[in-house]
Amino acid sequence: MRKLQTAALGVEHNRHLLFEAVFEIIQSRMFEFLGRKKAKKSEPVIRARPDHCISRKNIDRDALRVLYRLDSLGYTAYLVGGGVRDLLLGRKPKDFDVGTSAMPNEVKHAFRNCFLIGRRFRLAHVRFGQKVIETATFRQNSQTVGEIIEHAAEGPFEDNTFGTPETDAYRRDFTVNGLFYNIRDFSVIDWVGGLKDLEKKVIRSIGDPMIRFREDPVRMMRAIKFASRLDFKIEKDTEKAIRKLHSMILSASAPRVCEEVFRLFPYGKSEAAFRMMWEYGLMGDLLPELSEFIKRDGGRKSRVWKYLAMLDRYETAMAKQNYEVMNGLRAAVLYAAWALSEPGRNREIMGTMLSSLKIPKATYFLSVLMLDSVKRLSQPPERSRRRFIYNRDFPDALDFNRIVVRAEGRSEKVLDQWQNLYNEETSKET
């Protein structure tokens, strides 16, 4: 009965948060609409080619093909988002996305290798083998209050109205992600102050962060992801909004939240990311049992950070491994301080992550396997235990154990014996 009452209270709390968020969004749209006639037309900052470091040789060849093709047909076509940010920072972008004035069907007609996806807002995927260049028509925020209310419970409000480069820039999440690269004259276009924030190394919400985070609570996690990954600071008002609204993350779509949690691990910045998750309250919201374990003893928190710091050293070397396996290993490292302090409870402890974060079952089972392997690999490889080297996940379990041993400053002698045995057996097969 108590569980049912607690669940009911949780539902009521989330409903209250939802209505509060909808009210804020409607209010912001009204102010935006009423102020539109009075507002002067803003002009972007345009940084010409000699004044920035982006070179076409660093842009994906197929992305350039899309840009040049759309431009030759008379459409506006820009490189947009994180790709522009990373190029300006001298980093190699993971993705190259295109924004254009061309309608989705017009993009499809321009490329035989184009496929349209999405129901409420059509996106064009221009495929080159296994690679996809995502091409989106410029958007703007919808002014229809009915649409806001109708779709509010589905997660982030979808901007399903076509717009201009300016409106498209303002609907993005953070200023550093609102920059455009113009293929026509090779300039960088900045409507939102992203160039200054890149120079200041600041993550700043576009618009009022209290409203933007209510529109989509997952943006709070994205702020942490970018700040940790880029070694940036979160701007003061944006940070205050996260501290105040962190519990709204519980109203977000579970699969999106789970995906964003695992996006905190790559690039060797998980320790910094989870420190911020803890500081701003998001870790307590999403991983309550792990957070309670940490709160019971201050020394436990430092152990969690220590394991994550060691994982960060491994991330680059393991970047090409299977994504599913990597997430199992990452989850095990995150919970290692708790699980290794209470032997025999690995399934139960990882089960808390399964229930609270809704991680995939495969990730859960792999994380349990990693934790279970600690007892086995802490002893020399005698005959009774040798069968484990034939398990397909043995190399990853060995990596996990090295992370644990190195984080604790212990000898790797026994692990080296297992590694030698594994090398001998695999060499026989070849």
For the regions a protein language model found, what residue spans apply to each?
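Catalytic cores of the polymerase beta-like nucleotidyltransferase superfamily
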Residues: 2-9, 14-430
